[in-house]
């Protein structure tokens, strides 16, 4: 391809400020003419011949001035600016907390390229027209495999897991703090939204509930302990349709987790069940709560009630727990699910969940009537969900 001569604009004051010297325009033009650059004082530009491919901008013209003026004549100056003590930003401290939790669960950090292939969307079964397919194309890519900027961290995570699986590593847990790049529109008219996403991936020992437990540990460390639900309604084509959930708080999606769709696993040559989770780090930082208040050792005994509930299979445990949390009042101290049953003793489309609920008062020993009143309130609210005590 034939190269055409170009004109590079110059500014005498900027060149002098850049070099820290005081040279006149006439002297600069003389220097440029000595190397076959043709200055035009009227247009304030320099005509650059085709064989000078190294002259592209003002800094390149300044370099020519510096060479002829003499590097030894340029005065030395100390860097100027304010000296600060420094510190760790809020976002960085959040990331460090997350790393500490994840690594305690046996995960190792990985780093993958932000550039990837458009074929990744097909491997992930992402539908045509999906927002994730609106990726920024690289103007000078190394090749088609690195020609777009990623919009999801899953391709890099699954590729890393696949590499480990093909090297016969039997039990692998990886995580990555991965930036994704989401353009408002294409072609670009302004900078894309750059979001940091936490991607978790594992195969081998562990299942969906192990991954969910790791996510819960992260949320707990950040003080995000109430109002979090797991709703199996997210439209994630790359996840198993019956083993996935959106992580919700205040009707806002914090992320998602689930088992990788079998077809997607085959596309990445993963011959075993694989589990992933993706969390929006910015939203975690926004929801984090470190307002921890000291509570003294309880002076009065707790009262525990175990209940077994029967309901339709479509009712979520999160819905049950939300009712317990909201109806338990000040006496509610803790609750946990300890049994799930499906079988002959309940209906075909029903299931049974058993909860242990603990109550305690700060100023007195609870009587049976106190606890019964709260339990009646909880059970009455559960009736609105079609939930009843198991007989």
Question: Positions of the model-derived regions?
Answer:
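Core structural elements
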Residues: 2-8, 53-71, 128, 179-186, ...
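A glycine-rich phosphate-binding loop feature that marks nucleotide/adenosyl-phosphate handling sites
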Residues: 1-7, 45-51, 79-84, 112-125, ...
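A carboxyl-terminal module marker
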Residues: 34-37, 112, 184-187, 193-194, ...
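Flexible, active-site-adjacent loop/turn segments at secondary-structure boundaries
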Residues: 6, 53, 72, 76, ...
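Extended, well-folded interaction surfaces typified by the phenylalanyl-tRNA synthetase beta subunit core
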Residues: 8-170, 305, 358-360, 366, ...
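Beta-strand scaffold of nucleotide-dependent catalytic cores
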Residues: 59, 176-177, 256-258
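Short, structured patches in soluble enzyme cores that scaffold and shape functional sites
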Residues: 12, 48-50, 140-142, 179, ...
């Amino acid at each position: 391809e034939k190269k055409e001569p170009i004109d590079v604009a110059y500014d005498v004051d900027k060149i002098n400020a850049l070099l820290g010297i005081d040279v006149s325009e006439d002297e600069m033009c003389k220097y440029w003419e000595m190397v076959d650059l043709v200055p035009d004082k009227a247009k304030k530009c320099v005509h650059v011949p085709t064989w000078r491919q190294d002259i592209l901008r003002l800094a390149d013209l300044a370099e020519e001035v510096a060479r002829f003026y003499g590097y030894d004549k340029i005065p030395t100056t100390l860097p100027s600016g304010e000296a600060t003590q420094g510190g760790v930003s809020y976002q960085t401290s959040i990331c460090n907390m997350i790393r500490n939790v994840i690594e305690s669960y046996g995960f190792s950090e990985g780093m993958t390229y932000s550039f990837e292939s458009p074929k990744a969307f097909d491997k992930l079964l992402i539908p045509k027209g999906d927002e994730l397919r609106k990726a920024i194309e690289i103007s000078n890519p190394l090749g088609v495999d690195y020609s777009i900027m990623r919009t999801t961290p899953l391709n890099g995570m699954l590729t890393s897991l696949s590499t480990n699986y093909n090297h016969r590593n039997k039990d692998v847990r990886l995580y990555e703090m991965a930036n994704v790049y989401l353009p408002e529109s294409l072609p670009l008219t302004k900078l894309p939204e750059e979001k940091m996403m936490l991607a978790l991936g594992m195969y081998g020992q562990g299942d969906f509930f192990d991954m969910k437990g790791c996510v819960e540990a992260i949320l707990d460390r950040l003080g995000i302990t109430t109002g979090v639900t797991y709703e199996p309604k997210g439209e994630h084509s790359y996840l198993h349709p019956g083993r996935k959930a959106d992580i919700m708080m205040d009707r806002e999606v914090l992320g998602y987790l689930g088992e990788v769709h079998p077809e997607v696993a085959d596309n990445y040559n993963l011959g075993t069940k694989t589990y992933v989770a993706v969390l929006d780090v910015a939203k975690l930082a926004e929801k984090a709560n470190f307002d921890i208040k000291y509570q003294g050792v309880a002076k009065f005994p707790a009262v525990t009630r175990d209940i077994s509930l029967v309901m339709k299979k479509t009712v979520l445990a999160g819905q049950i727990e939300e009712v317990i949390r909201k109806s338990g009042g000040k006496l509610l101290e803790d609750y946990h699910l300890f049994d799930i049953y499906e079988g002959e003793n309940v209906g075909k489309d029903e299931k049974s969940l058993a909860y242990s609920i603990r109550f305690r008062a700060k100023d007195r020993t609870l009587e049976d009537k106190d606890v019964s009143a709260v339990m009646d309130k909880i059970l009455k609210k559960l009736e609105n969900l079609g939930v009843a005590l198991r007989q």
